[in-house]
């Protein structure tokens, strides 16, 4: 049994406030011992479990790229990253249906095609020279390609199924800050698109969005007040009870005795 786990870490500093990092890591996942044993478990004749001595270890590659910089003269910061991973020889349970006995036989098998990628960009800048007014934006996106064996019902063999999902998100905020007041307006939007090759009923196109404000007050004699008010909404779910609007208000008062 060999566990192969290569690692690479690279960092380059362009200057004191800008740097690039690249990280790679490979990991090996061994099959479970019970999956490798050439044993037939027929204690339940209608649900037979069979091992697979020919299973290969799964191997996952993970790559991360990260960059950030800060421009002091404009009080501006930029950050971005990209993550990618794929897995060879993933393990999924395959089911075979016996029409004569009505029983099902389950056996683990290797399957390929699993990978995902996600990325983000953050931009924060001061609008004025004093750094009192600020704007921040954070954009994210991702894609997932998931492959497995799937039985549509109890009387059918497993088939290779592919689920493709994509998500995009954005958060935008503007803020004002001085010695005693912090005030922010923000809004966010997230969209998820998912398609299932064998189960169209599992397809999704959903939206989640939120908007509101955050306020922090620093009062005399060690007293501070903070509050936030946000409207959170969801749309696109087949279950109407999940398509909701929620208004959430939080408030806090604190006092320091020191």
Task: Map each language-model feature to its residues.
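Exposed, low-structure sequence patches enriched in small/polar residues
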Residues: 1-258
